[in-house]
């Protein structure tokens, strides 16, 4: 038994290194070790859908890991949780987790619990919801780093900040729904996540769910494919707080707009708090149903604009302090003066400064700052000038030519590092140059999943901030795509 647990731990450790944090949480957080023999390890999945998806996505890789670790004779078997025996169902249903653990240790109770019931108790510790109190609704996408305390307030975002804090303190009261809108990288996600984290702190019994509009869409599509729409509706219509990021990603998506409309109504009628973010005012949304737009404007709409000079200086100072670097006043002011786009670009400039200091062991001067600023401005101009006339084939053509690859390489399943890296870059460029969803990008790159594509995009985005070579390569490829 213990050896089986150890082997399962080895498998989890290996897979965790290969997946993003969100992807690992989605598929492996709710799997539990049940039993083991010399030939097999039994793992419990929360439901048949989850079981089938894990088998489909990861069985091959798990077998490879077992072989690598010298356990090639062992098979991992995924099973659904055992059903409660009818004779004990009511007893378990009305018992809290604390009471169950007491019963399990009690001598008089132990004599009447058969083996099957003990197994139920073991599983119950993991996923039975107590009916007498609310259970904390675990949310893998709420990041603890986003708080009101570390949000830098200025004239451009003060109203949005105050409204967000008020919502967290008194959800469902004053500003419901609330829509925070503004350009990219101005702090909308920071505020939305801060609302979730502060509400979770102040209202521990609340069921809170933060989700991007794209993940909301993908989950809805998946629920249709697997005939799990009832589960989807139940999940989203029985919340105390729903936070949806980047609602503009649902433009031109009529089916999900219809579903969101009904979800909105269900939550609104129960005075449950909803907060959305968007890159524009509701009235400017294209191919968005009027009745859904009217729902957004029913509550508070508040904008975040670009930071002024003083706020840009404060943002740079804070980021430099977090990264442990000292930025001379003249350099700090130069960056704040030149980079006027958004918070994300300001923080990227500081990250690039740190990379020069750490990797080249040099002191920062104005020439280095000018180079960094030119890179950032060039990248922003590329994004601004990009339109849908740049098609998929032109992007692929540049990737294949410049990285010396074939169609088979870019659309296949080769694990060679240089080819894997190229696929990451291809996904990243498709995301930046087109309006394709991650599911659509996945189909182009050899049938990859949404999670795999999202991992690729996030990986390159992160590496651009920390690896000058990768950043320069991406800029070069973008320039060639624009000229192609």
UniProtKB/Swiss-Prot annotation:
Subunit structure and binding partners: Oligomerizes as a right-handed, spiral filament on DNA at oriC.
* Keyword DNA-binding among record annotations: yes
Q: Which GO terms describe its biological process?
A: DNA replication initiation; regulation of DNA replication
Map out region (Domain I, interacts with DnaA modulators) in residue numbers.
Answer: 1-73
Q: What name is this protein filed under?
A: Chromosomal replication initiator protein DnaA
State which gene encodes it.
dnaA
Q: Pfam family of this protein, just one? A: Bac_DnaA
Note down the stretches annotated as region Domain III, AAA+ region: 141-357
Q: What InterPro entries does UniProt report for this protein, alphabetically?
A: AAA+_ATPase, Chromosome_initiator_DnaA, Chromosome_initiator_DnaA-like, Chromosome_initiator_DnaA_CS, DnaA_C, DnaA_dom, DnaA_N_dom, DnaA_N_sf
Q: Which organism is it from?
A: Borrelia turicatae (strain 91E135)
Q: Where in the cell is it found?
A: Cytoplasm
The record's listing under SMART domains reads: AAA, Bac_DnaA_C
């Amino acid at each position: 038994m213990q050896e089986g647990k150890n082997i399962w731990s080895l498998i989890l450790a290996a897979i965790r290194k290969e997946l993003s944090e969100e992807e690992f949480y989605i598929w492996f957080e709710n799997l539990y070790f049940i039993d083991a023999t010399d030939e097999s390890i039994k793992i419990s999945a929360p439901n048949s859908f989850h079981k089938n998806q894990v088998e489909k996505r990861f069985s091959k890789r798990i077998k490879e890991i077992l072989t690598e670790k010298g356990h090639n004779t062992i098979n991992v078997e995924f099973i659904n949780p055992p059903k409660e025996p009818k004779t004990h169902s009511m007893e378990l249903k009305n018992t809290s987790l604390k009471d169950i653990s007491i019963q399990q240790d009690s001598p008089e109770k132990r004599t009447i619990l058969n083996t099957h019931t003990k197994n139920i108790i073991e599983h119950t510790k993991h996923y039975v919801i107590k009916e007498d109190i609310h259970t904390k609704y675990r949310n893998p996408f709420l990041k603890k780093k986003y708080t009101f305390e570390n949000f830098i307030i200025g004239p451009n975002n003060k109203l949005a900040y105050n409204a967000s804090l008020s919502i967290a303190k008194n959800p469902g009261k004053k500003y419901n729904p609330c829509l925070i809108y503004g350009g990219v990288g101005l702090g909308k996600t920071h505020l939305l996540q801060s609302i979730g984290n502060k509400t979770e702190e102040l209202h521990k019994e609340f069921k809170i769910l933060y989700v991007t509009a794209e993940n909301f869409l993908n989950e809805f599509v998946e629920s249709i494919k697997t005939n799990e729409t009832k589960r989807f509706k139940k999940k989203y219509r029985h919340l105390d707080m729903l936070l949806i990021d980047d609602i503009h990603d649902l433009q031109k998506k009529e089916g999900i707009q219809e579903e969101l409309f009904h979800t909105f109504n269900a939550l609104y009628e129960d005075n449950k708090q909803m907060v959305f973010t968007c890159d524009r005012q509701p009235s400017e949304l294209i191919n968005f149903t009027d009745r859904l737009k009217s729902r957004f404007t029913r509550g508070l709409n508040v904008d975040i604009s670009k930071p002024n000079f003083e706020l840009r200086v404060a943002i740079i100072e804070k980021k430099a302090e977090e990264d442990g670097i000292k930025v001379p006043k003249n350099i700090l002011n130069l960056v704040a003066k030149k980079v006027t786009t958004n918070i994300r670009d300001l923080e990227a400039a500081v990250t690039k400064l740190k990379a020069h200091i750490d990797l080249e062991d040099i002191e920062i001067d104005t020439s280095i700052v000018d180079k960094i600023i030119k890179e950032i401005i060039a990248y922003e101009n590329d994004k601004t000038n990009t339109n849908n006339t740049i098609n998929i084939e032109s992007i692929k053509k540049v990737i294949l030519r410049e990285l010396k690859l074939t169609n088979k390489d870019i659309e296949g399943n080769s694990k060679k590092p240089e080819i894997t890296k190229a696929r990451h870059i291809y996904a990243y460029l498709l995301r930046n140059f087109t309006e394709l969803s991650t599911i659509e990008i996945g189909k182009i790159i050899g049938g990859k999943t949404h999670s795999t594509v999202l991992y690729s995009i996030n990986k390159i985005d992160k590496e651009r901030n920390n690896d000058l070579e990768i950043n320069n390569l991406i800029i070069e490829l973008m320039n060639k795509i624009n000229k192609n």
